[in-house]
Amino acid sequence: MNSAFTFLSLAIFPLALFIFWTLSATGPSSPLGRGFPTLTNKRICLLIAHPDDEAMFFAPTLLALTKPELGNHVKILCLSSGMCALLMVLDSASGWFLIYQITGDAAGLGHIRKQELQKSALRLGLRNESDVFIVDDPSRFPDSMTATWSEENVSGLLASAFAPQLAAQASSQSAPMATIDILLTFDQSGVSYHPNHRSLYHGARAFLKALMRGNSGHPCPVTLYTLTSTTLARKYIGVFDAPIAMLSGVISNAFGGSGDRDALSTSPSKKTQELRGIREPPPANRLLFVNSVDDWLSGWKAMVYAHKSQMVWFRWGWITVGRYMVVNDLKKELV
């Protein structure tokens, strides 16, 4: 009797998991997908610190926002070429694995990781390799687990890339302008508390403050969304974190003002709005993206097949049960 019950449980579990996962997904084919805000007809930049950040942390976001029917143009800006590697050595005396950090191009991975990022980006829906920009400036942006990047350097780079006329605007009364509408990056905890990740958050906020300096009467042309960091336990429960993130989003939407409710409806394109005299609804306070099984496999393949140099043993666990391979919830930052 017990063996029959165990067999039945093992047989039902995969089916139950598939049904649960399908219902939790937020894509257009999901039964619940249309109930969550998204972005349409936007110029979007994902700001990351290292090649593979886009696959290990932001795959659900990229796979969702690059859907052709949404009309978004997504780019990736990576501030290092990933020339830091971790070397794990078994210490025969203690029996423990010791981790050494190799910096510079001692690991010979710099040019390889640039190519891997481009391949991964295409698997995650970007239109072209030219939409991936990689900064190779170790003096300002060293790939290091201990170095904090200057927020002025990050902000200055963003300004030169997306608001080159910023200096001229500072002395005029015209509305601030930028060549992107949406900036995505890590939050202040950086998911893993990596100092490079956390530096992007502070640099991105400094960039928006620079855009608005002396322009308080105008709306900011760039909306900043940051990826929510979670507890250690939630990081490794995969799709089972979806209900938690959904509940958090619903509560936030209920008390977050009208912006989220307005953004629930599909808005017409900017050009159509201008012709009709329609004011574009404000961006949602929170965004939630939950991969379908197919999209999870796409993100999994982006990491496994594109970032081959990074597939050491402990990353297999992350891409298999890690919640960031399935669930992304992003919060709009008020600057």
From Swiss-Prot:
For this UniProt record, give its keywords in alphabetical order, as a comma-separated list.
Endoplasmic reticulum, Glycoprotein, GPI-anchor biosynthesis, Hydrolase, Membrane, Signal-anchor, Transmembrane, Transmembrane helix
Cross-referenced InterPro entries = GlcNAc_PI_deacetylase-related, LmbE-like_dom_sf
Q: Which GO terms describe its cellular component?
A: endoplasmic reticulum membrane
Subcellular location per the Swiss-Prot or TrEMBL entry? Endoplasmic reticulum membrane
Output the Gene Ontology terms for molecular function: N-acetylglucosaminylphosphatidylinositol deacetylase activity
Q: Which reaction does it catalyse?
A: a 6-(N-acetyl-alpha-D-glucosaminyl)-1-(1,2-diacyl-sn-glycero-3-phospho)-1D-myo-inositol + H2O = a 6-(alpha-D-glucosaminyl)-1-(1,2-diacyl-sn-glycero-3-phospho)-1D-myo-inositol + acetate
Give the transmembrane ranges: 3-23
Going by the entry's taxonomy, the superkingdom of the source organism is recorded as Eukaryota
Its membrane topology, per UniProt? Single-pass type II membrane protein
Q: What is its EC number?
A: 3.5.1.89
This chain is glycosylated at N128, N153
Q: In which pathway does it act?
A: Glycolipid biosynthesis; glycosylphosphatidylinositol-anchor biosynthesis
**What's this protein's family per the entry?**
Belongs to the PIGL family.
State its role. Answer: Involved in the second step of GPI biosynthesis. De-N-acetylation of N-acetylglucosaminyl-phosphatidylinositol.
Q: What is this protein called?
A: N-acetylglucosaminyl-phosphatidylinositol de-N-acetylase
Q: Which organism is it from?
A: Arthroderma benhamiae (strain ATCC MYA-4681 / CBS 112371) (Trichophyton mentagrophytes)
